[in-house]
Amino acid sequence: MSSIRVIRGGDVFRIPCNETDTLLALLRRAGCTLPAACGGHGRCGKCRVSVNGVPRLACRVVPEDGDEVILPPAAGGRILTETLDPPAAPTGESGCAAAVDLGTTTVAVRLYDLTTGRVAAACAGWNAQAAYGADVISRIQYTREQPDGLSALSGCIRAQVESLLTQALAQTNREARELKRVVLAGNTVMQLLFAGISVEPLAAAPFQAETLFRQPVQDTLLGAPVHYLPCAAGYVGGDITAGLLASGLAEKAGRFLYLDIGTNGEMALGGRDGFVCCAVACGPAFEGAGVTCGMMGVDGAVSRVRYNGKFEMNVIGGGAATGLCGSGLIDLAAILVRQGVIDETGRLLPPEEVPERMRAFLTRDENGNGVFHLTDRVYLTAGDVRSLQLAKAAVAAGVQVLLAQQGITLAELDGVYLAGGFGVYLDPSSAAAIGMLPQLPAGRLHSIGNASLAGASMLALDASRAADALQTAERCRYIELSGRADFADAFTGGMTYEPVTRR
């Protein structure tokens, strides 16, 4: 049988090959995670490997018998599991229960001791579906293009969660038979893929999923029943329901904006009287894809940038900078706006048009646009600024539509809650400087960590809270933004690189 030799770090192994499958397809089949933000269409450049010493894109090369393939190191870095902790108290049950946050980029698991109500173990990993695309749209497309697409995506994520649960059980010397339930929260697409339910209806209007998990779906993992958080709509999932429940906003008087920003920006505005909600397609820029030197929040990624006469940065893992993750990208863009390197229209200016203190960092591309060099290896292009511009305009426009639906202004918001890993690392002043988020007093802006995991944890500890979760989802009124003139107008206005308060 024909095979290739694969090297990743200190691991060396062989996998079978044939005359038709790309290297990316072979690696997927072998369970080797390799980023493919564009879904394997040769556009993102994130699946670059070495084949017989030559740099190649795994999605574009069909390896031959005997080839040697060197893969980049597996992604390292910290995955957010910190969250709003439910009060630890005896539940009256024995055994254990698990909460799972099924994110598009990461997967986090918490195992709870039901006797004490305390966390017994926690595990996390980068979502194995990244090999099929960085965002839910590319994964939906994969299921439509490939006859076995749905089973492949469902199988790989179920295997990953099962592996994480097994690790958590092993950490506490427990057996699978002690697991009473698994509560899972994710966006609607991720929950459908996990359950093995077709996501094709979400590829076109009216974007109605086969189920919103408001009725029980029969499913088990390691012999324990799986409970899915109910979703608000096709693109506002159980992760938002979980977050609204865990943050207390579902029971709080006032008008609060809840944001979970990633490749799919989900948001809700309201309080105990109900919510209006929507989703915007941010694209993968916030996750580091579609950006020349972009990367996920892994070792080597610049996560924070500051300028006080000189540039300073935080690098995940503490080593040399190799790229920009979403929070670092926004910090850098905000600095360049303030320093006159990016103008209001989003143009990255060439050296001769910027203040003298910035000129040493700039070169020109073949079209005469500026290229900003943060380090020798990390730089920002005009195309990168454009990718960020589209993503941040989508978020700002979604917020404006929700405000208009509620008939209130930014000043009348009682608070803004930022959920998820991106919300933890995002500098709100940077997001405000580029016109992505409103500028609010510090006391009204709250970063609440992995609220999806917190909501799932509440139901893992107390199964009766499922009724509260269902009520929360049913009290969310979904606004479909596609085709709306007010969203299109707000999106156009949001393209400028200036604070929201000036528009």
Model-flagged regions — what are they?
Residues 4-5, 74, 78-83, 223-242, ...:
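Acidic, glycine/GT-rich loop-and beta-edge segments that sit at the periphery of enzyme/chaperone cores
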Residues 33-64:
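Local cysteine-cluster metal-coordination motifs and their immediate loop/turn environment
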Residues 160-171, 240-243, 389-411:
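Phosphate/ATP-binding catalytic cores across multiple sugar-kinase/actin-like superfamilies
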Residues 4, 53-102, 107:
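Fe-S ferredoxin-like electron-transfer domains
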Residues 337-406:
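A contiguous, well-structured pocket-lining segment that forms one wall/lid of small-molecule binding clefts
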Residues 109, 117-135, 201-216, 242, ...:
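Glycine-rich phosphate-binding loop of actin/hexokinase-like ATP-binding domains
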Residues 174-208, 433-438:
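Short beta-strand-loop/turn "lid" adjacent to the catalytic site in phosphate-handling enzymes
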Residues 271-273, 404, 408-473:
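Catalytic phosphate/nucleotide-handling subdomain of diverse soluble enzymes
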